[in-house]
Amino acid sequence: MARITVEDCQKRIDNRFLLVQMAIKRVQQYREGYEPLVDSKNKEVVTALREIAAGKVMPEDLALYRPAEGEEMPVAE
């Protein structure tokens, strides 16, 4: 299984501080009962980073998100 790194996540979220805040918030959501959005048997933090790297978790301010090559920018609801 491939290792997930902060650099993988920074392809989508450029700001390291925002990235950490997003991962923390996602871990808190798991502990409240939310289900992971990706298949992972890793610890909560690694699962959160995998979700961010996969583009499954977005920052509240979509202007801070960079879509992957060939991916369209998500629309705020």
Curated annotation (Swiss-Prot):
Entry EC no(s): 2.7.7.6
UniProt keyword Transcription present: yes
Enzyme class: transferase
Assigned keywords, A-Z: DNA-directed RNA polymerase, Nucleotidyltransferase, Transcription, Transferase
BP terms from Gene Ontology: DNA-templated transcription
TM ranges: none
Top-rank taxon: Bacteria
Catalytic reactions on record: RNA(n) + a ribonucleoside 5'-triphosphate = RNA(n+1) + diphosphate
InterPro entries in alphabetical order: DNA-dir_RNA_pol_omega, Pol_omega/Rpo6/RPB6, RPB6/omega-like_sf
Role played: Promotes RNA polymerase assembly. Latches the N- and C-terminal regions of the beta' subunit thereby facilitating its interaction with the beta and alpha subunits.
Protein name listed in UniProt: DNA-directed RNA polymerase subunit omega
Natural source organism: Nitratidesulfovibrio vulgaris (strain ATCC 29579 / DSM 644 / CCUG 34227 / NCIMB 8303 / VKM B-1760 / Hildenborough)
